[in-house]
């Protein structure tokens, strides 16, 4: 039975205990326990305790340092404490003995309680990846050893309430109320498809479908026909040939009979007399038709042995229907990335945006700049980052561990294979190299290159250097880095970027794939950068720049020009063309940059940014954090991994998105309070007629700070991505004009039923992980009531404090229950939900 909890615990074990692919070194004779004592002891702090135990047979002297990773927080050090915790950068910490430390005898434990700023909300916030480095009698560091951490997460009755988080905790009552919306039966047949076709007309009668299929196609559709044949064979066990059989599938060329914005994706399907005719004017359209056909056949397998005769007419409303995957923070291996491409193609998503570089790693080979992958694609124990980068996000000390998501990159050959595979499935891959901020990995790699050559060839050492060693600037990035911004006044910086861009262009060319867009990041450049660089001051004088921030505009202007000369559209996060005060940066008004609008939090005035840009003439992709950041936790529950700074995101929040009425897209604010959607747009900037034309698409984001396995990527995707896929294809739902009325709720219930009845079984059949919605439980008049948003799920519960399993009591009807603590789970298609807890007071 696969659960998110089991996946998390399994991956946590790998993070804490795992070593390299070779011989595993012995674990340390130390162990740690981390306890959250109380969340938000004061307005800004939570209290937590580290317990260090000596499991060896000798006293533990002061010749050790323990390193670990944790979501960036600020530890408040106690006075005269025996231990101290120091942040080495972002998520990387060390714990070491102070002058008040006394040797720890065998079998003894030292307890260290400390206040930390922020609040811990779930499993993604705990310490991970601990290891110890000891020194011998001469002070020489010995090989690192793993230190297991036991996590004593939360005492729910203590930690669930936070003074700074009024969002309701997802306990039994919370889920019961949520699930009540879906308790009524919904009529949902095999024509419930994602995304929904524009028009489905039943023409009467049915056509049988035989496992023996004759596949015919026009020459223009040969590649799509071969792929369809492969999918019919592998997914539906069909015997496909070109001989006449009872079932005939034909792919035919046609002229698009209507005016639509994206005629290359238009298609029709006609089913009649056991003949399934797919028609389109373009290969992309016929591919879309094939995906709809496969979905119909999947649904047919669940409900019938025949297909209704029908005529489907379909096309998308948005030309950009994308997913951004961060492979920099934690890596996604090539095989898993190809699986993701298949998954996206099922639902007619047509853009895969790969975040290939960031502060924590660089993930694509650049011939001639080997240090980017030899050093910056690996993380492990280091004091100078000359061989690898510091550890981050749970993976510990071993930079040679090929199973760790800390380590890895796409070789040139790998990347070209990915491009070809995506092209076959009509998915465009947009590479992102994030600059000038979020560039620490590249900076450290080029610093190491400098050190390698400086004694023998100064010119070669400085050729691609990205930092001014004399720069005294002090700054702190959003992720707590102090050294992650490249120096934009150095010629070597531009030489480096030209080299990187040209090598990536060459990979596309050699793969036979057109590179149409290149994402340059441009986000979260902190205040204080470049102020202490004499190189920058001289550069400003020479180029007539008056403010430090002008350097960023100058730099990005050069990069946009670099791409324009290569006929590549520049893409960037909204930060490129927005000023810090959320006004439009007029400097880029005439640029062609495509803007990803992400920081759209209403409480910070960010919800108006997309329409400000669109109205000003900038093309916009809606990436709204509150709707489409898929790595946000599903809900406020300790077992649900993910972040929450932008709110909680589930499959209903993605469904709620209204691209042309964006202010009505969120139904709760950051505090968890209900939003009056009717009044949400009052006083906000409306979308103009010109602005309407500049909304080019939607994109969901999966940042990987909290990712510990590819199964977790899938867990974040499903079922959240269904709302994204649906809204990108059908931008104006039937309920758009009455977003709080009966039409909205009826459509939402049908949406949920389609996911439960057809899409989750489809995913299970293909071995794709997904989240099972937890059951609701409550007591009334001494009876235990339960419900679920998944009618076919089995609910099991316990009353003794233990975790429910497949052998626990099954809830079927209200039952007498006076237990003070009740736990329940939903079981469905070989998977199970997180645990629902109810304190029955």
Over which residues does each language-model region extend?
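Acidic, contiguous N-terminal accessory segments
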Residues: 24, 131-316, 572-580, 761, ...
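Low-complexity, acidic Ser/Thr/Pro/Gly-rich terminal tails and inter-domain linkers that flank the onset
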Residues: 23-44
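Feature activates predominantly on carbohydrate-active enzymes
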Residues: 264-484, 490-509, 513-517, 699
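Active-site neighborhood of glycoside hydrolase catalytic domains
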Residues: 477-592, 600-605, 610
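Short acidic, flexible loop segments centered on an aromatic residue
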Residues: 40, 58-89, 128-131
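Short, compositionally stereotyped local motifs that mark structural "simplifiers"
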Residues: 216, 737, 741-841
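Flexible, acidic glycine-rich loops studded with aromatic residues
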Residues: 569-577, 582-783
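Asparagine-centered strand-capping/turn motif at beta-strand->loop junctions
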Residues: 38, 52-58, 489
């Amino acid at each position: 039975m696969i659960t998110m909890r089991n996946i998390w615990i399994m991956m946590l074990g790998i993070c804490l205990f795992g070593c390299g692919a070779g011989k595993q070194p012995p674990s340390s004779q130390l162990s740690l326990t981390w306890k959250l004592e109380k969340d938000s002891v004061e307005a800004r702090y939570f209290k937590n305790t580290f317990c260090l135990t000596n499991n060896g047979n000798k006293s533990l002297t002061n010749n050790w340092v323990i390193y670990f990773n944790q979501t960036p927080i600020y530890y408040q050090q106690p006075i005269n404490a025996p231990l101290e915790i120091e942040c080495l950068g972002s998520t990387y910490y060390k714990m070491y003995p102070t002058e008040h430390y006394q040797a720890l005898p065998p079998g003894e434990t030292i307890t260290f309680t400390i206040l930390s700023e922020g609040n811990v909300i779930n499993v993604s916030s705990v310490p991970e990846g601990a290891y110890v480095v000891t020194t011998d009698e001469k002070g020489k560091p010995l090989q690192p050893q793993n230190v297991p951490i036991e996590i004593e997460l939360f005492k729910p009755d203590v930690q669930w309430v936070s003074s700074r988080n009024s969002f309701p905790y997802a306990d039994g009552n919370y889920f019961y109320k949520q699930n009540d919306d879906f308790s009524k039966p919904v009529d949902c047949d095999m024509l419930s498809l994602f995304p929904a076709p524009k028009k489905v007309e039943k023409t009467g009668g049915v056509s049988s479908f035989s496992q023996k299929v004759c596949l015919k196609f026009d020459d223009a559709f040969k590649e799509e026909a071969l792929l369809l044949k492969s999918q019919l064979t592998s997914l539906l066990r069909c015997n496909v040939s070109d001989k006449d059989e009872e079932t005939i599938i034909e792919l035919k060329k046609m002229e698009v009979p209507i005016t639509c914005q994206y005629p290359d994706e238009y298609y029709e399907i006609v089913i009649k007399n056991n003949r399934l005719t797919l028609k389109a004017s373009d290969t992309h359209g016929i591919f879309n038709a094939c995906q709809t056909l496969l979905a119909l056949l999947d649904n047919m397998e669940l409900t019938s042995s025949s297909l209704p005769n029908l005529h489907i007419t379909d096309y998308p409303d948005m030309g950009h229907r994308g997913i951004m995957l961060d492979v920099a923070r934690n890596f996604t291996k090539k095989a898993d990335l190809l699986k993701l491409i298949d998954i996206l193609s099922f639902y007619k998503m047509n853009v895969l945006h790969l975040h290939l570089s960031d502060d924590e790693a660089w993930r694509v080979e650049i011939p001639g700049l080997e240090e980017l992958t030899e050093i910056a694609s690996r993380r492990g124990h280091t004091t100078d980052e000359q061989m690898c980068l510091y550890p981050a996000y749970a993976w510990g000390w071993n930079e040679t561990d090929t199973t760790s998501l800390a380590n890895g990159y796409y070789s040139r050959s790998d990347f070209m294979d990915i491009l070809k595979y995506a092209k076959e499935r009509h998915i465009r891959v947009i590479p992102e190299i994030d600059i000038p901020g979020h560039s620490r990995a590249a900076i450290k790699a080029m610093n190491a290159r400098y050190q390698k050559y400086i004694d023998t060839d100064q010119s070669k050492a400085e050729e691609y250097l990205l930092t001014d060693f004399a720069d005294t600037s002090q700054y702190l990035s959003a992720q707590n880095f102090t050294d992650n911004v490249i120096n934009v006044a150095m010629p070597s910086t531009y030489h480096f970027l030209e080299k990187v861009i040209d090598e990536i262009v060459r990979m596309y060319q050699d793969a036979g794939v057109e590179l149409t867009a290149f994402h340059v990041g441009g986000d979260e450049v902190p205040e204080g950068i470049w102020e202490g660089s004499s190189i920058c001051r001289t550069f400003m004088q020479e180029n007539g720049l008056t403010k430090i921030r002008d350097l960023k505009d100058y730099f990005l202007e050069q990069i946009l020009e670099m791409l324009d000369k290569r006929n590549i559209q520049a893409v960037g996060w909204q930060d490129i063309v927005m000023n810090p005060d959320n006004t439009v940066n007029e400097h880029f008004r005439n640029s062609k940059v495509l803007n990803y609008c992400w920081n759209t939090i209403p409480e910070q005035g960010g919800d108006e940014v997309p329409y400000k840009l669109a109205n000003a003439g900038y093309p916009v992709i809606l990436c709204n954090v509150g709707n489409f950041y898929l790595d946000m936790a599903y809900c406020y529950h300790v077992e649900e991994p993910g972040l929450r700074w932008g709110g909680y995101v589930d499959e209903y929040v993605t469904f709620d998105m209204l691209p042309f009425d964006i202010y009505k897209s969120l139904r709760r604010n950051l505090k968890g309070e209900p939003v009056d959607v009717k009044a949400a747009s009052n006083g906000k900037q409306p979308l103009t007629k010109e602005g309407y034309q500049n909304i080019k698409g939607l994109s969901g984001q999966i940042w990987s700070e909290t990712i510990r396995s590819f199964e977790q990527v899938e867990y974040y995707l499903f079922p959240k991505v269904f709302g994204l896929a649906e809204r990108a294809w059908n931008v104006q739902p039937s309920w758009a004009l009455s977003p709080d009325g009966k039409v909205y709720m009826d459509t939402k219930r049908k949406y949920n039923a389609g996911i439960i009845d057809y899409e989750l079984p489809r995913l299970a059949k293909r071995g794709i992980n997904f989240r099972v919605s937890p059951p609701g439980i409550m007591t009334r008049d001494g009876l235990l009531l339960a419900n679920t948003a998944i009618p076919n799920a089995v609910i099991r519960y316990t009353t003794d404090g233990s975790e429910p399993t497949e052998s626990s009591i099954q809830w079927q009807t209200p039952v007498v229950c006076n237990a003070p603590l009740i736990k329940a789970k939903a079981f469905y298609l070989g998977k199970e939900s997180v645990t629902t807890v109810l304190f029955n007071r």
